[in-house]
From Swiss-Prot:
Glycosylated residues in this chain: 233, 402, 421, 431, 456, 648
Lineage, broadest ranks: Eukaryota, Metazoa, Chordata, Craniata, Vertebrata
Protein purpose: Integrin alpha-V:beta-8 (ITGAV:ITGB8) is a receptor for fibronectin. It recognizes the sequence R-G-D in its ligands. Integrin alpha-V:beta-6 (ITGAV:ITGB6) mediates R-G-D-dependent release of transforming growth factor beta-1 (TGF-beta-1) from regulatory Latency-associated peptide (LAP), thereby playing a key role in TGF-beta-1 activation on the surface of activated regulatory T-cells (Tregs). Required during vasculogenesis.
Topological domain spans for side Cytoplasmic: 704-768
SMART domains listed in its UniProt record: INB, PSI
Residue ranges that the UniProt entry lists as topological domain Extracellular: 43-683
Domain comment in the entry: The VWFA domain (or beta I domain) contains two cation-binding sites: the ligand-associated metal ion-binding site (LIMBS or SyMBS) and the metal ion-dependent adhesion site (MIDAS). Unlike in the other beta integrins, the cation-binding site adjacent MIDAS site (ADMIDAS) in ITGB8 is not functional due to the presence of two Asn residues instead of 2 Asp residues. This domain is also part of the ligand-binding site.
Protein name per Swiss-Prot or TrEMBL: Integrin beta-8
Residue span(s) of domain I-EGF: 471-495, 499-547, 548-584, 585-625
Transmembrane segments: 684-703
Gene Ontology molecular-function annotations: integrin binding; metal ion binding
InterPro entries the UniProt entry points to: EGF-like_dom, Integrin_beta_N, Integrin_bsu, Integrin_bsu_VWA, Integrin_dom_sf, PSI, vWFA_dom_sf
Gene3D superfamilies xref list: Laminin (2.10.25.10), ligand-binding face of the semaphorins, domain 2 (3.30.1680.10), ntegrin, alpha v. Chain A, domain 3 (2.60.40.1510), von Willebrand factor, type A domain (3.40.50.410)
Binding positions (Mg(2+)): 154, 156, 254
Amino acid sequence: MCGSALGLPPAAFVRLRSCRPGPAAFLRAAWVLSLVLGLGRSENSRCASSHAVSCSECLALGPDCGWCVHEDFISGGPRSERCDIVSNLISKGCPVDSIEYPSVHVTIPSENEVNTQVTPGEVSIQLRPGAAANFMLKIHPLKKYPVDLYYLVDVSASMHNNIEKLNSVGNDLSRKMAFFSRDFRLGFGSYVDKTVSPYISIHPERIHNQCSDYNLDCMPPHGYIHVLSLTENITEFERAVHRQKISGNIDTPEGGFDAMLQAAVCESHIGWRKEAKRLLLVMTDQTSHLALDSKLAGIVVPNDGNCHLRNNVYVKSTTMEHPSLGQLSEKLIDNNINVIFAVQGKQFHWYKDLLPLLPGTIAGEIESKAANLNNLVVEAYQKLISEVKVQVESKVPGVYFNVTAICPDGARKLGMEGCSNVTSSDEVLFNVTVTMEKCSVTGGKNYAIIKPIGFNETSKIHIHQNCGCECEASRGGAAKCAEEAPLDSTCPQCQESQCHQEEAQSPSQGCKAHEDQPVCSGRGVCVCGKCLCHKMKLGKVYGKYCEKDDFSCPYHHGSLCAGHGECEAGRCQCFSGWEGDRCQCPSAAAQHCVNSKGQVCSGRGTCVCGRCECSDPRSIGRFCEHCPTCPTACSENWNCVQCLHPHNLSQAILDQCRTSCASMEQPYVEQASECFSSPSYLRIFFIIFIVTFLIGLLKILIIRQVILQWNSSKIKSSSDYRVSASKKDKLILQSVCTRAVTYRREKPEEIKLDISKLNAHETFRCNF
């Protein structure tokens, strides 16, 4: 155990009193002293003023707190004085070898490394609350991966032309992919939608042929059918595609996500290889149903994310919901599958918007009859192998990961953002920082997985939580048990035979804070005059009288003490760097409340999460600096009055005006009589009357002019037919009366009609 402090075999904690006196012990003590020389005053006061009454509580306060286990240390004083930074404990007289101070270790086994792309494959970290550990993860892409490409095609009627194009893509695509892979395989599957109403027509005449509107013979609708497993035989792939018939449904969205999840999790059916780069090509021209859409058909059972293929047919299509985007993303990442959405038409942008929610996916727009399908696949694959991103899975409660990518060009990006334009000769580094704010309920040894998206290798991070002390682990005997029982409900219970006689006679004595309070606050049992607190599902109950707990503190955004502190006696005890009644505010936020004079909120308010809340209702402004009606408003700004008349002022005063009085508002004062004459109501009445009269008169004139103009045009149009009475000659009108007579004769008879001229006043008639 001594060697762990010197960087030799790792140990769970530094326990100096377990080492024998000698050079090793001296070096160990020197290491502890050098470790704590740089501690700040904030941690010093935090450890010393924490009122921690057990070693575990002390170590949970922060990475710099230590606990003195020496029996004679501060004899007669409060137990909380045993908790402090190591340098203070030593100065108070605690022997160096009696200080509990867990250390942080990162161990990377050099032997048995099997990974070739992601190294190291395993990392072992020992953490304590508030501490952080750091290591580098290296990712080196291979030059030529084996590639498994599975075509998942929407075979609804609108995709008829695109399916015909698939008959000829096999050989051409295989030739193009040979440049990137020496081992290329193809597979094929089809999907439509759930085979229930309202997604398909259940009319007896259309149940087996949904394409009657297209005058086509279609196969029955189906949720997902696995047609061909991954194979190197391109001819077999083309034959399977050639035999494929289209199907149909009646609503616009399809069941694509349902089929994608089955293609991802049914590894043995599809034939996914562990060592291959797995590509899932989804061809469609419509959107896909999302989770909860199935409720329209009365399907309410959530998707369980498991494989349900029977005879290559998805048999749970009509009984389970569509998967959610989060569930689909999880299954794709777990199975190292990259998705290429090949979309035709206006729905391309719908899939493009989903890319941030589905890591490792690419969307491309296919042309009419899928003319550019092969080029789309090749370009998408080039982009996928040139991107390196990681994701942390199986997070341990209370343990957080911060990942920063160091790209080959020197750029630093967040882990989820990753690096682009990476070649097979490049190496991408990821700086991984692991922190533990508090110990999880499970405790012990846990692990997390760092998984590069689309890679078949991972890095497993073993996390050992140093949340206890050796003094507690080696505790034994009645005396130790009685000493620790009130402080830790996990302490073994004392046997009745170990109790002193006087304690056995009054078992509840010492288990009440006051006589009128229940035994152990009603949340524990009294054993040997000491409270043993109950274990509760809500959290931990502790304290001498079980009066404290870690679950009755305020919540912030659904987390107890915002996840940045621990609950003690109903109050949040914030971790280092956080403050507030719910530990919701960073400590550094207080600097945003300081004005130019160094005052917090100008002395008129309090700083809450980096924002000033003015306590004086008359104060306004970001720093509560404006208070026009405050008694001190004039005295505070009196020196700025002379800045309003800058004539004959010295340069020093002018400089002061520019700096200190630049924000002063200069009000504009208008000189006016204090008394105003009463308005003349009679004058206002006449003005309104005259204006109204003139407007009405104007309307009448306009209407009159329109009527005259209309009459004039009417008279003019009838003047052509007016007969002048001055003419002596009578007007002779020529009238013509015709009648068509048809005779069936070989030689029609000629008829002569003589139309005489009639006077205008005579009546004209035709007699036949």
